[in-house]
Amino acid sequence: MTLQLNTIALLLVILLILGVLSNNSAITISAAVLLIMQQTFLSSHIPLLEKYGVKIGIIILTIGVLSPLVSGKIQLPDLSGFLSWKMALSISVGVLVAWLAGKGVPLMGEQPILVTGLLIGTIIGVAFLGGIPVGPLIAAGILALLLGKI
């Protein structure tokens, strides 16, 4: 087996290093898995990840978000809780963020190079500004809004 030393491999190594430096396990693990896949016989499965990866990731994320409800850690509020202005605002923000993320998916497909910029921006925000990684889908949705794609 010979290593493929190409631009994509270099980018994945850089993302891996930035992920480690910024303590961002999602970036670190993703870059490591893709680098291993690219450099081994697993490369034939990359088109499957490309086709279904975002959908599978969203399903896993949704399971993670809903699991506290199922486990009982989070209780549903009573009717008066749903009628408060804070609940109405939180629902509205949730709708806006979901809509933005939905607009980000096509942009990521149309211009995948922008994903690299979004990831680098996220890593910089985490490493130097004390931010937390909120997800490239939402960032891509905001970018789509700024680029006039919406």
From Swiss-Prot:
InterPro entries listed in its UniProt record: UPF0756_TM
Entry GO CC: plasma membrane
Topology of the protein relative to the lipid bilayer: Multi-pass membrane protein
Pfam families listed in its UniProt record: DUF441
Protein's UniProt keywords contain DNA-binding: no
Keywords on record: Cell membrane, Membrane, Transmembrane, Transmembrane helix
Transmembrane segments: 1-21, 52-72, 81-101, 123-143
Record's subcellular location: Cell membrane
Top-level taxon of origin: Bacteria
Family: Belongs to the UPF0756 family.
Record-linked PANTHER family: UPF0756 MEMBRANE PROTEIN YEAL
Protein name: UPF0756 membrane protein CGSHiGG_08995
Organism name: Haemophilus influenzae (strain PittGG)
